Amino acid sequence: MTMATTVSKGKVTQVIGAVVDVQFEGVLPAILNALETTNNGKKLILEVAQHLGENTVRCIAMDATEGLVRGAPVSDSGTPISVPVGNATLGRILNVVGEPIDERGPIAATEKRAIHQKAPDFQSQSTESQILVTGIKVIDLLAPYSKGGKIGLFGGAGVGKTVLIQELINNIAKVHSGYSVFAGVGERTREGNDLYHEFIESGVINIDDLEKSKVALVYGQMNEPPGARARVALTGLTLAEQFRDQSGTDVLFFVDNIFRFTQAGSEVSALLGRIPSAVGYQPTLATDMGQLQERITSTKAGSITSVQAIYVPADDLTDPAPATSFAHLDATTTLSRAISELGIYPAVDPLDSTSRLMDPQILGEEHYNTARAVQGILQRYKSLQDIIAILGMDELSEEDKLTVARARKIQRFLSQPFDVAQVFTGSPGVQVPLDKTIASFKAVVAGEYDHLPEAAFYMVGDIEEAKAKAAKLAAAAA
């Protein structure tokens, strides 16, 4: 790719929403180059998307274009959008082009990195499987996460994706020596603000000495133009790649929400005049997703474990956007509205959530057998629900009645109080070690706690807490 040695100058010829056409006199800037202009006294970055002929390029604006006029001068930066990386970004909030938006002064980074990078080659990738313990029972037992894997949180609106992501950051940042990067892609500004202040309160961001913080934040919220929302995930990933390569640790990369990345790509695609494909999405949907996801990987230097919230439009998992994401994931955590309606949080569907690690050679026989036994009881309960709805519990055999009773206890035992939800629930959050999770569920499946009431299993940690709650309930009833 040849770059112009002198800075190419051009002028704006057309503005259609977030898409801007720029005509150049001499050498055309390369595709994906960043162009600079000013709008209302503020710097505006444009990214080259198409060469149209007649020395004109079509660009996507990374900020609002209201007030931009034809004839405005534009200069080519000669490189793609580059953002500050390294420890100077810790505890800070950046926007898509790497500018600080937390009102804490400029970022003193010595190094910048282009947001468009190639995925690591085969030789440098690492392939070993190791479980990443989250302290959340339902995840660790039934759909465990792998270090350096990609995890998808699927769910419709309002079933708890963001709260689960916040709890994962909270749990892992506390027990984890590595760094986290959080990319807020097209989600609510209020949530981004709340998250920032929660990080400060919990000590994940050290406001007195920012470089001792454990997380860097990159935001491109709902009110941003589609160009910013389509690129902000790449900005966050670029920060995560730098932490992985420089420190050689396990970096956690959180994206909330990957669907908005697709949605922004679809808006940009329509503005660029591409013919839409299925359900109105961009024809390059799989390519866009692949370019992002293939960069999220473990190398011999370190690993990036990514947790991605994936909004499911109208709760339809066959929609092209969530369906395209499925292909890239190692584990899926599906949040179910039916479970959230029962008041069971986290509302993880124990039968619909999957993991590549569900293998006795990776997890060990005890963990694998316990998980499969739990799923077996829940599956049997699910198949009996139609009979119960039509004929009632009395028509079931004694064995089935016992299965239903155990399944209802297991269902409640899969709930857990969260640290980040303490303001809603009033009860302090708990993290349950993996060995206690396995032992507790093994005992429940074996029928050792058939004598405890259902309510004792709701919103507790391990089985000892359930026993203590049962004793408290018995004392209150006496």
From Swiss-Prot:
Keyword set, alphabetical order: ATP synthesis, ATP-binding, Cell inner membrane, Cell membrane, CF(1), Hydrogen ion transport, Ion transport, Membrane, Nucleotide-binding, Translocase, Transport
Gene Ontology molecular function: ATP binding; ATP hydrolysis activity; proton-transporting ATP synthase activity, rotational mechanism
Membrane topology: Peripheral membrane protein
Subcellular location: Cell inner membrane
Sites where the protein binds ATP: 155-162
Purpose: Produces ATP from ADP in the presence of a proton gradient across the membrane. The catalytic sites are hosted primarily by the beta subunits.
Subunit relationships: F-type ATPases have 2 components, CF(1) - the catalytic core - and CF(0) - the membrane proton channel. CF(1) has five subunits: alpha(3), beta(3), gamma(1), delta(1), epsilon(1). CF(0) has three main subunits: a(1), b(2) and c(9-12). The alpha and beta chains form an alternating ring which encloses part of the gamma chain. CF(1) is attached to CF(0) by a central stalk formed by the gamma and epsilon chains, while a peripheral stalk is formed by the delta and b chains.
HAMAP family: ATP_synth_beta_bact (MF_01347)
Protein name, entry field: ATP synthase subunit beta
Source organism per UniProt: Fuscovulum blasticum (Rhodobacter blasticus)
Gene assigned in the entry: atpD
